[in-house]
Amino acid sequence: MNPNQKTITIGSVSLTIATVCFLMQIAILATTVTLHFKQHECDSPASNQVMPCEPIIIERNITEIVYLNNTTIEKEICPEVVEYRNWSKPQCQITGFAPFSKDNSIRLSAGGDIWVTREPYVSCDPGKCYQFALGQGTTLDNKHSNGTIHDRIPHRTLLMNELGVPFHLGTKQVCVAWSSSSCHDGKAWLHVCVTGDDRNATASFIYDGRLVDSIGSWSQNILRTQESECVCINGTCTVVMTDGSASGRADTRILFIKEGKIVHISPLSGSAQHIEECSCYPRYPDVRCICRDNWKGSNRPVIDINMEDYSIDSSYVCSGLVGDTPRNDDSSSNSNCRDPNNERGNPGVKGWAFDNGDDVWMGRTINKESRSGYETFKVIGGWSTPNSKSQVNRQVIVDNNNWSGYSGIFSVEGKSCINRCFYVELIRGRPQETRVWWTSNSIVVFCGTSGTYGTGSWPDGANINFMPI
């Protein structure tokens, strides 16, 4: 091969190699661009579709490093879009209740700065549970705690902490309120906060940390709400509110709220005669509430809320073992499912129950005269059969030698079912314990279990003689 041929051959080989390298670089570049922009293909609508102008909440944004031919490519995983809760799973089948949480607020107040509270409740977002209470604008070891037996003062605020964390000085004050309800729709918290003059109070609706709507008193007689969690289904939340006499005819309305904005108000209908302090739970696709009749009945009213057409029905729990306090002895108490039993209806106490097929699970004070002790049990046929009294699976939560108080329900969504849980308010101080001038509480919390369980009693536990006066 002469020199010219060698030169041509070497040049041809070099050109071929250069061309191959150039094509490889183009391929690598194309791969990089494709992977980088792949994220924009996630759930993208067709070109002829209109994208709704709604906010997207990014829950997490993860970056993965992928190595390809010594070239580093950053691939971003598609963000998850947070959805509204719909509570469509079935209710968990349980055998009873197991201990879940206890905050020991009063015992801790003997040596620390803990808020004076009452009207506690529990509610959960999709990942975590929180405890709420109405603070009195003071800690217990503080002269301002004198006279905190009073319910409605302008200094009361709604407090919010992770469940199990007592209300210390660093606790968030969510809103101004002497009556409240809170719930999470899957995207953000809704707080319903009532405060102001007894004859002209205001309910503020706070969503995602912002005031969105409000409503004034409609009967000029202590506008009030649940003192436990509201319920949201597919982005619409519902809360029961009453304005009017606490021991006579009152005006109860059911409000429907979308991202903090009132979208509909329905009047109470059905056979319930008086409604206070409802304990509500999701019963997909609707919501059910068990309330307090402070006028005519020691059997508890039931409100069924249709979340689609906003219709309302009401009745009473069928169980002849009634849930309110005061009440008749079990042997003489009655309920016909439709009407108040006209047995010691006033004053009453906030409580809860929930249906389980034809049966009903319920909780109540052990003492039929006052707010002491606490028990739970199931009544066979208690949801469907008038005056049913067959009791099973009874548990003592607080023995009858210790004070209890309000109680209410909250729901927790598991992997396969929705569990029902409840809290008990453990009131200390006045009016029962007159050595001190304050009134406050701690809480104990139980949740449904399909397992076995033991026995015990979980009272507040503070020695009143150790407490500040």
UniProtKB/Swiss-Prot annotation:
Entry's Gene Ontology molecular function annotations: exo-alpha-sialidase activity; metal ion binding
Mod. after translation: N-glycosylated.
Annotated spans, Disordered: 325-349
UniProt name for this protein: Neuraminidase
Species: Influenza A virus (strain A/RI/5-/1957 H2N2)
Glycosylation sites per record: 61, 69-70, 86, 146, 200, 234, 402
Region described as Involved in apical transport and lipid raft association: spans on this chain: 11-33
Membrane-side (Intravirion) residue stretches: 1-6
Transmembrane parts of this sequence: 7-29
Cofactor(s) named in the record: Ca(2+)
EC number: 3.2.1.18
